[in-house]
Amino acid sequence: MFGFLLLLSLPFILYLVTPKIRKMLSSGVCTSNVQLPGKVAIVTGANTGIGKETAKDLAQRGARVYLACRDVDKGELAAREIQAVTGNSQVFVRKLDLADTKSIRAFAKDFLAEEKHLHLLINNAGVMMCPYSKTADGFEMHIGVNHLGHFLLTHLLLEKLKESAPSRIVNLSSLGHHLGRIHFHNLQGEKFYSAGLAYCHSKLANILFTKELAKRLKGSGVTTYSVHPGTVHSELTRYSSIMRWLWQLFFVFIKTPQEGAQTSLYCALTEGLESLSGSHFSDCQLAWVSYQGRNEIIARRLWDVSCDLLGLPVDW
């Protein structure tokens, strides 16, 4: 009888505790009052989710914001929504397919011809747990989009970021990087492939890239940070029915895209973070990085291998 009554009361208990759980899990809010008139920002994957909320906040602060999206139609819808909400007409959509180096190079070429400055590069876009597939250039999709695509984009825009200093680069990683390993003999999933692990490997690559990039940018006025946005309801789960089911089951513990954008915004806007360039953040504070994520030898080798795969000079 007691068990039956407890079961009946469970919805009421959840109703009472859910707000407290949500408040606890959404901790970490960007409280910066920095305004951005005259500043230029690029946010990849900004047509939806965390990227759209990040772009919206930057636009609210007066920045010229470029939504770099694979789906231009969805990007235009997002841009109109952001313009309507913020009153900022300087929100633009440009085609960027991170699974195609030709598209990345075309985006960068057009942007550099269009803009004199770039102050914020938010490498937000990504894929998660997709079936084994390859990019237009033959890279495994996770490492190709999440790491190599943003690696190339950053390379192509870096001189503009230096010219516009102080400027910042924010790379979205994940708590999942703790499960990641960089196996150079299986970087493309040639010998063994797991969609979940491939995602984790690529998120570890984001952290290693941030770490190595920060070393190379020391004294340039450009700083870089990696972030874990939290567990966020987004379109990243579109390839996994299991993940979509888990997201629905544990909805209480899932952040909204706006909440998920807070750490990206914190790293992009908070004054005084320059000395922490190369660091990893979660919930708007420094976060623990896995052992391999702190390995400078692996970071340097991944840099060299990435340059080789993309046909880039090693010293940039």
Swiss-Prot record:
Catalytic activity: all-trans-retinol + NADP(+) = all-trans-retinal + NADPH + H(+); 11-cis-retinol + NADP(+) = 11-cis-retinal + NADPH + H(+); 9-cis-retinol + NADP(+) = 9-cis-retinal + NADPH + H(+); 13-cis-retinol + NADP(+) = 13-cis-retinal + NADPH + H(+)
One Pfam family named in its UniProt record: adh_short
Molecular-function annotations in GO: 11-cis-retinol dehydrogenase activity; aldehyde dehydrogenase (NADP+) activity; all-trans-retinol dehydrogenase (NAD+) activity; all-trans-retinol dehydrogenase (NADP+) activity
Classification of source organism: Eukaryota, Metazoa, Chordata, Craniata, Vertebrata
Keywords: Acetylation, Endoplasmic reticulum, Lipid metabolism, Membrane, NADP, Oxidoreductase, Signal-anchor, Transmembrane, Transmembrane helix
Database matches in InterPro entries: NAD(P)-bd_dom_sf (IPR036291), SDR_fam (IPR002347)
UniProt note on tissues of expression: Expressed at high level in liver and testis. Expressed at lower levels in smooth muscle, thymus, submaxillary gland and epididymis. In testis, expression is restricted to pachytene spermatocytes. Also expressed in four layers of the retina, including the outer segment of rods and cones.
Cytoplasmic compartment residues: 22-316
Gene: Rdh11
Entry PTM: Not glycosylated.
Miscellaneous: Shows clear specificity for the pro-S hydrogen on C4 of NADPH and the pro-R hydrogen on C15 of retinols.
Activity at various pH: Optimum pH is between 6.5 and 7.5 for nonanal as substrate.
Protein name: Retinol dehydrogenase 11
Induction of its expression: Down-regulated in liver by fasting and rose by refeeding.
Organism this protein belongs to: Mus musculus (Mouse)
UniProt entry tagged with the keyword Transmembrane helix: yes
Positions bound to substrate: S174
Enzymatic class: oxidoreductase
Region forming the signal peptide: none
Catalytic residues (positions): Y199
Annotated GO CC locations: endoplasmic reticulum membrane; photoreceptor inner segment
UniProt binding sites for NADP(+): G45, A46, N47, T48, G49, I50, G51
Annotated knockout phenotype: Deficient mice are fertile and developed normally but exhibit delayed dark adaptation vision. Testis and livers of deficient mice exhibit a lower rate of all-trans-retinal conversion to all-trans-retinol.
Broad class of the protein's primary localization: endoplasmic reticulum
